[in-house]
């Protein structure tokens, strides 16, 4: 029997929970004005006394809330309670791995990793300088290209005199030969690139019968290094190298330059070019813009110039290439070509770049850089201006590296689609269909079948922001994953279009932690380690883009990361103190995961101003974990019914009837709720106590329901299970506490978009529950638990094996995650920070349970290393 689709399943699983009380929104169900406010104080008496009283003040009355031997004090200065003073013989102690992040471990790591406090003045200076870079983005900043400058310098004077039309470019060549006799990017060396640029400059100087010394030095360099081309990897070849290099070799031969024409590699590449020229479809060459326009100087013997002019860009160039445009001008005299070249020289003075303009690529990569480095919050206005510019040039077939570029680039288009969609722009994934061949494979440019690692990485990252039903995005995901895994198997997994510091590290991270299974601070830490401020780019020649690769970005990212980390460390210490002072450290049936819980929220809502949000979320999660463990390991249904009743009545006088461990739990919850309510009232401008209590009652009812199932060994239907378990996972409860402290005043309408009534909250809970169950059901079954998504699904479908049921659950989860993405990206009425909190809770669940039970077993799993890197280990 086939599994029902996610859409059909969600149609009969209620989006809301079925409770008798209204849903937890304002106005509250409870008459909050009639509920007394209790404030904690403690009176431990003499140090010798065994009796400790906890007092809660109601107005001027002092009520004894806990009396007797072993009663709990919330004061951090009270006597430490011994666990063995109140064992419940019926309470099942669970064998959890002990917490790793104890105070001594934390103190030891922090003391050994001390870094100097961030220089606030330096931070402000860097922010100002980077803002200036964004504001200065015009047509694109890039370094000189000796190769393109040589082609422009070949253009003869229009008056027929024996001089170059652009003499300043010839002078630039004479003055910019490197010490080793070559021309090219001084601080990066690729044999192909250096020889190509050097050959172009030698030819131009020879044409103009000048610079004999430079020509001779260039020839010597060429002879010395030409044999090295055979050993350099093919994907280090500049774009169009197989066309332009052999063409220049032929020209050099006609000029009688003394070069090693008989080298096997040179003979081989000449033959390769001849074969490729025969395969170029002429109908394609002249009818639609293709990447061939980028290197027309290497195709001169086959080009019909009067036809190719029809594909000229509006700015007069051919794919923004000065060299290609110069070649067309020398063959046609086209005035628009000359206008473009004049414009380039007006901009750069005495040289030409590899591309001009390159405005779209520069803006997109700059935005991507600050976002991935985790410093984008400083540049919101600049990012919006850049993205508005990109969007204004967005086309139904994608975009290229420049606004007038008629050939779309898959790397730029994929990055644009992803970033625009993540920032709320309406863009269709249909643009990706432009880049598919007849076999369904994706290519980089029209007319070229080769692909680069960076292009495929950008396409892969783009595929993870797909909406349900976007088949082209799903196909892109599968295609790029296959390509990237294969690239990693190559020892030289380098890129076709760029020389990045650690492209292998970027690919490994993207494949291991895709967007739905990553968190912002994790990605920032990874990219800080992989980002190269001196990375080079490879077009027809090598070039640098200083507004994309710049040490200022990295310096700010490091200062900011370490500063935020130091703030988080102080917060974690306070939370550890609260954990102990609340008596939770003495409970023997629960898990000490304070650091892991704090990591999950600090990796998402990391900004310093969200400290209260982090504290509330962490404390609430700790209480949820404790109560979940209490209900799972309950001594009796009666005890937890009493706990539920106390929460409903909010009645401290029920404490005397509670076992000591339950008393600790209730007092901890009671004081936390009051703390949150008081702070929430200040932030929201209205009473939120009833709202918070209502959330806890809903949460505890689901815990109670699951405890009853366990007690009765009852396996519910899948529908019944999901209705309860998608709430018991506690995602909605936790984020609904947290959203009160995101800096927004929340209306009833906003809350209705993210509370239990919303599809957003339902999908968050559903995906969290399903990933949790897939990784914990076997261990919990061994402890006597009978209800999980897998077991309940098998009850409904006895024809399925456990393995088959597990696959169906994974399919359901992936479909639900796709719907969750759509809710996140399309929600317009919810403030961004509120959306982030909801969505990143779901992402954190996927991260923690990616390989196993990363929460319970966190001390023994990779989560431990994540916690260390984000919370304790500064960036050097």
Swiss-Prot record:
Query: What EC number(s) is this enzyme filed under?
Result: 4.2.3.44
**Gene Ontology CC terms:** chloroplast
**Per UniProt, which keywords does this protein have?**
Chloroplast, Lyase, Magnesium, Metal-binding, Plant defense, Plastid, Transit peptide
Q: How is the cofactor bound?
A: Binds 3 Mg(2+) ions per subunit.
- The residues that the entry says bind Mg(2+) 2 are 628, 632
Q: Where in the cell is it found?
A: Plastid, Chloroplast
Q: Where does Mg(2+) 3 bind?
A: 772, 776, 780
Q: In the record, what terms sit under GO molecular function?
A: magnesium ion binding; terpene synthase activity
Which reaction equation describes what this protein catalyses?
(+)-copalyl diphosphate = isopimara-7,15-diene + diphosphate
Motif DDXXD motif: residue span?
628-632
The record's annotation in InterPro entries points to: Isoprenoid_synthase_dom_sf, Terpene_cyclase-like_1_C, Terpene_cyclase_plant_C1, Terpene_synth_N, Terpene_synth_N_sf, Terpene_synthase-like, Terpene_synthase_metal-bd, Terpenoid_cyclase/PrenylTrfase
Pfam families per UniProt: Terpene_synth, Terpene_synth_C
Please state the pathway this protein functions in, per its UniProt record.
Terpene metabolism; oleoresin biosynthesis
Q: CDD domains of this UniProt entry?
A: Terpene_cyclase_plant_C1
Q: What class of enzyme is it?
A: lyase
Q: Which cofactor does it need?
A: Mg(2+)
The UniProt similarity line reads:
Belongs to the terpene synthase family. Tpsd subfamily.
Per the entry's comment, what about the domains? Answer: The Asp-Asp-Xaa-Xaa-Asp/Glu (DDXXD/E) motif is important for the catalytic activity in the class I active site, presumably through binding to Mg(2+).
* Biological role stated in the UniProt entry: Involved in defensive oleoresin formation in conifers in response to insect attack or other injury. Involved in diterpene (C20) olefins biosynthesis. Monofunctional enzyme lacking the DXDD motif in the class II active site relevant for the cyclization of geranylgeranyl diphosphate (GGPP). Requires (+)-copalyl diphosphate ((+)-CPP) as substrate, but no activity with GGPP or ent-CPP. Isopimaradiene is the major products of the enzyme followed by sandaracopimaradiene.
Protein's UniProt name: Monofunctional isopimaradiene synthase, chloroplastic
């Amino acid at each position: 029997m086939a599994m029902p689709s996610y859409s059909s399943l969600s149609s009969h699983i209620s989006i809301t929970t079925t409770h008798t009380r209204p849903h937890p929104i304002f106005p509250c169900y409870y008459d909050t004005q009639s509920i007394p406010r209790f404030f904690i104080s403690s009176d431990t008496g003499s140090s010798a006394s065994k009796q400790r009283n906890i007092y809660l003040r109601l107005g001027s009355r002092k009520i004894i809330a806990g009396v007797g031997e072993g009663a709990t004090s919330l004061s951090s200065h009270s006597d430490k309670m011994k666990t063995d003073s109140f064992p419940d013989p019926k309470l099942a102690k669970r064998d959890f791995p002990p917490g790793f992040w104890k105070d001594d471990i934390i103190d030891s790591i922090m003391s050994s990793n001390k870094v100097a406090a961030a220089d606030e003045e330096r931070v402000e200076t860097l922010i100002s300088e980077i803002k200036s870079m964004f504001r200065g983005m015009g047509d694109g900043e890039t370094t000189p290209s000796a190769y393109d400058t040589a082609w422009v310098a070949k253009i003869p004077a229009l008056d027929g005199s024996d001089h170059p039309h652009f003499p300043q470019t010839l002078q630039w060549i004479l003055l910019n030969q490197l010490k080793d006799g070559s021309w090219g990017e001084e601080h990066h060396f690729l044999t192909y690139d250096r020889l190509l640029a050097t050959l172009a400059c030698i030819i131009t100087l020879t044409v103009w019968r000048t610079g004999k010394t430079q020509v001779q030095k260039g020839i010597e360099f060429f002879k010395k290094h030409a044999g090295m081309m055979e050993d350099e990897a093919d994907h280090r070849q500049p774009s169009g190298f197989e066309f332009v290099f052999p063409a220049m070799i032929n020209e050099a031969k006609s000029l009688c330059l003394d070069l090693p024409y008989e080298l096997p590699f040179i003979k081989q590449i000449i033959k390769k070019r001849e074969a490729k020229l025969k395969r170029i479809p002429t109908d394609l060459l002249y009818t639609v813009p293709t990447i061939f326009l980028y290197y027309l100087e290497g195709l001169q013997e086959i080009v019909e110039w009067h036809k190719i002019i029809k594909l000229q860009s509006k700015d007069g160039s051919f794919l923004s290439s000065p060299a290609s445009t110069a070649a067309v001008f020398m063959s046609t005299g086209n005035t628009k070509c000359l206008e473009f070249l004049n414009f380039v020289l007006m901009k750069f003075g005495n040289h030409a770049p590899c591309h001009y303009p390159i405005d779209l690529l520069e803006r997109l990569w700059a935005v991507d850089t600050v976002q991935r480095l985790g410093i984008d919050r400083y540049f919101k206005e600049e990012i919006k201006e850049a993205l508005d510019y990109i969007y204004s040039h967005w086309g139904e077939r994608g975009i290229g590296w420049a606004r007038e570029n008629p050939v779309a680039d898959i790397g730029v288009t994929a990055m644009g689609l992803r970033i625009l969609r993540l920032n709320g722009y309406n863009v269709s994934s249909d643009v990706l269909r432009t880049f598919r061949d007849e076999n369904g494979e994706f290519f980089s440019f029209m007319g070229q079948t080769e692909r680069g690692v960076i292009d495929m990485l950008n396409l892969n990252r783009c595929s993870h922001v797909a909406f349900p039903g976007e088949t082209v995005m799903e196909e892109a995901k599968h295609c790029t994953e296959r390509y990237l895994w294969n690239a990693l198997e190559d020892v030289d997994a380098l890129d076709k279009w760029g020389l990045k510091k650690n492209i292998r590290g970027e690919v490994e991270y993207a494949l291991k932690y895709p967007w739905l299974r990553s968190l912002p601070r994790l990605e920032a830490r990874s990219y800080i380690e992989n980002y190269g401020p001196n990375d080079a780019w490879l077009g027809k020649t090598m070039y640098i883009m200083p507004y994309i690769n710049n040490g200022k970005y990295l310096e700010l990212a490091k200062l900011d990361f370490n500063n935020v980390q130091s703030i988080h460390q102080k917060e974690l210490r306070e939370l550890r103190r609260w954990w102990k002072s609340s008596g939770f450290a003495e409970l023997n049936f629960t898990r000490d995961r304070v650091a892991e819980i704090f990591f999950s929220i600090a990796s998402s809502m990391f900004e310093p101003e969200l400290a209260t949000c982090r504290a509330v979320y962490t404390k609430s999660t700790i209480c949820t974990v404790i109560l979940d463990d209490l209900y799972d390991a309950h001594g009796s249904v009666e005890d937890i019914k009493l706990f539920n009743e106390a929460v409903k009545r909010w009645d401290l006088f029920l404490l005397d009837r509670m076992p000591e461990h339950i008393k600790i739990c209730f007092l901890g919850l009671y004081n936390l709720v009051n703390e949150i309510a008081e702070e929430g009232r200040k932030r929201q401008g209205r009473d939120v106590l009833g709202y918070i209590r209502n959330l806890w009652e809903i949460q505890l009812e689901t815990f109670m329901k699951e405890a009853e199932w366990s007690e009765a060994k009852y396996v519910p239907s899948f529908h019944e299970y999901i209705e309860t378990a998608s709430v018991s996972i506690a995602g909605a409860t936790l984020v609904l506490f947290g959203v009160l402290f995101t800096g927004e005043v929340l209306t009833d309408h906003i809350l209705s978009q993210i509370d239990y009534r919303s599809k957003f909250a339902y999908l968050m809970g559903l995906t969290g529950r399903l990933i949790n169950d897939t990784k914990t059901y076997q261990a919990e079954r061994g402890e006597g638990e009978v209800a999980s998504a897998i077991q309940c699904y098998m009850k409904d479908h006895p024809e399925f094996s456990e393995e088959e049921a597990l696959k169906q659950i994974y399919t359901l989860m992936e479909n639900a995650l796709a719907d969750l993405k759509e809710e996140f990206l399309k929600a317009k009425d919810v403030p961004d920070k509120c959306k982030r909190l909801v969505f990143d809770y779901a992402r954190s669940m996927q991260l923690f349970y990616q390989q196993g039970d990363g929460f319970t077993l966190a001390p023994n799993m990779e989560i431990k290393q994540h916690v260390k890197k984000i919370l304790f280990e500064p960036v050097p």
